[in-house]
Each structure stands twice: as C-alpha cells, then as structure tokens.
Regions:
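ATP-dependent carboxylate-amine ligase catalytic core
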Residues: 20, 35, 45-47
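Active-site/binding-pocket entry motifs
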Residues: 38-39, 133, 156
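Short glycine-rich substrate-engagement loop in P-loop NTPases that contacts/grips substrate
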Residues: 41-54
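NTP-binding/hydrolysis catalytic cores, primarily Walker-type P-loop NTPases
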Residues: 151-175
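Phosphate/oxyanion-binding active-site loops and adjacent basic polyanion-contact surfaces
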Residues: 46, 98-101, 162, 166
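Phosphate-binding loop that captures ATP/GTP phosphates
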Residues: 1-32
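Conserved catalytic-core segment of NTP-binding enzymes
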Residues: 52-65, 70-146
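Conserved P-loop NTPase mechanochemical-coupling segment
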Residues: 29-41
Length: 175
C-alpha cells in the first residue's frame, strides 16, 4: 500500500499500473492490498487521494465490492465521499456503549443529509462482529438495516475465521 500512497501523493506515477502491481490475492478469491510498510503513510491520505484511489480501483474491474476500513469522520469531505458509495456498512460489536455511539452518529448523519442534500443515512447497514449473546444486543431502530452478526470465535486461525464468516448468508446482501 505504501507504493500506492506514494503514487497518489506524488501524482507522477500511473496509479492504475501501481494498483495492478500491488494487488494481492488470497485462496478465497479475495483481492486486496498489503498493509502499508509504515502505519503513518495512511494518515497522509486526504479525501482527494482516497477519491482518486477509489476511481482507479473501479476502473481496474478487479473488485465486485470495495471495502474501506477507516475511521469515521463528520467532515464535509468525508461525508461527500461516503454519500457517493452505493452502501456504507458499519461494523459494531453490539455492546450497549457501541450501540449508543452508533445511534448518535446516525442522528448526525441525518442532520448532514439535510444540510448537504445527501442520502447517506438510507445507505447505512450494520454488521455485528464478535457478537455475544451475553454482552451484545441488536439496535432497535427501524430506519437502520441490520444485515446480521458474526459470533465471537475464540482462538481460530485466519483461514478458520474466513470459513466461519463466509457461512453467513447475509454477506450475499452486500453489493
């Protein structure tokens, strides 16, 4: 990913070629980029860099769905970027504190929708990760689509985790 970030920031390289050369594949047919060599590299990306990266990824035709794992922000740039997506899937553990935080964020998104004339709130869906019947609960909000949950899996190897996750049929509803 560091090479792609450098290409995006320098604007001197062919981003499409850099994406193609950096693409990795796993045994499950998932295409992905390796983590950055230095974690701070990703902090240097601005919204324009991310938009360009997404456009180049879409042009490459190597992905059915694009997953962006990043921090949530209420800034206008990030809002406009997220509103351009077909779906925005948030992941929560279903703990009471996580549910309250998500509900508050969802209310803020509704306000931003009205301010900017967008429709992000209607694109939001939730997946529960590490869901436990003892410490987790689903949100009671008829406006938010809850796709499903992935139970807590202790001590599993990465391949075992992927197998368990892929057994969830709700993942077919993404995209």
């Amino acid at each position: 990913m560091s090479d792609i970030i450098y290409a995006l920031k320098s604007k001197k390289s062919n981003i499409g070629l850099k994406i193609e050369s950096s693409l990795r594949h796993d045994e499950f047919g998932v295409n992905f980029f390796a983590s950055s060599d230095v974690a701070l590299d990703t902090c240097e990306l601005n919204v324009e860099n991310i938009e360009l990266l997404i456009k180049e990824i879409q042009l490459s035709d190597n992905f059915d769905n694009v997953i962006i794992d990043g921090r949530f922000s209420f800034g206008k740039d990030m809002y406009v970027l997220m509103d351009g997506f077909n779906e925005c899937i948030f992941v929560s553990d279903g703990s009471p504190s996580s549910n309250v935080k998500f509900q508050n964020a969802y209310k803020c998104i509704g306000i931003l929708d009205r301010q900017y004339g967008g429709s992000l709130a209607g694109k939001i869906k939730v997946i529960y990760n590490r869901f436990s019947s003892r410490s987790s609960e689903t949100m009671e909000n008829g406006e938010i689509t809850i796709l499903g949950g992935i139970k807590r899996i202790e001590g599993a190897k990465p391949a075992e985790l992927v197998e368990q996750i892929m057994e969830n049929t709700f993942l077919d509803e993404i995209g």
